Amino acid sequence: MPRSQINGNFIDKTSSIVANILLRIIPTTSGEKKAFTYYRDGAIMSAQSEGNYAEALQNYYEATRSEIDPYDRSYILYNIGLIHTSNGEHTKALEYYFQAIERNPFLPQAFNNMAVICHYQGERAILRGDSEIAEAWFDQAAEYWKQAIGLTPGNYIEAHNWLKITRRLEFE
């Protein structure tokens, strides 16, 4: 087994142990514990990282039924969006990213992922010969990237450069 895989397994196991200890000692309601358990099983227990998207989605959906904190819920919804993105289900992914941002408007990675999807749709429209639709998708991508960059200046360098090159950058 390669060293990186051994280290990864060690980190996963350590994270699981720490999460279990915290779950026992931090005062939480039974609903919060249940939500965290589903979240942990969906994310920390490697279902998502191993490509078991159906299992991870099931755990995330269960977590959304139990989690009431908007901030925590935003990350669960964001992770559901990630899985739908990985599966090529871009419309569903956008829906979950929107829901995540509604609960936590300071989630630059959700804005970035929405921009990437819009940019991809713009590229597809170009291949179909529909430049007007492509421009609309690119304009939307630009808006999302501006929001992501505004939240985390210095990140998303490639997006920043694309905004400059395409003359869609209005701030600076």
From Swiss-Prot:
Recorded GO CC terms: chloroplast thylakoid membrane
Membrane topology recorded in Swiss-Prot or TrEMBL: Peripheral membrane protein
Main location: plastid
Keyword Membrane: yes
Keywords of the record: Chloroplast, Membrane, Photosynthesis, Plastid, Repeat, Thylakoid, TPR repeat
SUPFAM superfamilies noted in UniProt: TPR-like (SSF48452)
Source organism superkingdom: Eukaryota
Locations listed in the record: Plastid, Chloroplast thylakoid membrane
Ranges for the TPR repeats: 35-70, 74-107, 122-155
Gene3D superfamilies, sorted: Tetratricopeptide repeat domain
InterPro entries: PSI_Ycf3_assembly, TPR-like_helical_dom_sf, TPR_rpt, Ycf3/AcsC/BcsC/TPR_MFPF
GO terms of biological process kind: photosynthesis
SMART domains assigned: TPR (SM00028)
Pfam families linked: TPR_1
PANTHER family, per the entry: CELLULOSE SYNTHASE OPERON PROTEIN C (PTHR44943), TPR REPEAT-CONTAINING PROTEIN MJ0263 (PTHR44943:SF8)
Family as reported in the entry's similarity comment: Belongs to the Ycf3 family.
Function, as annotated: Essential for the assembly of the photosystem I (PSI) complex. May act as a chaperone-like factor to guide the assembly of the PSI subunits.
Record-given protein name: Photosystem I assembly protein Ycf3
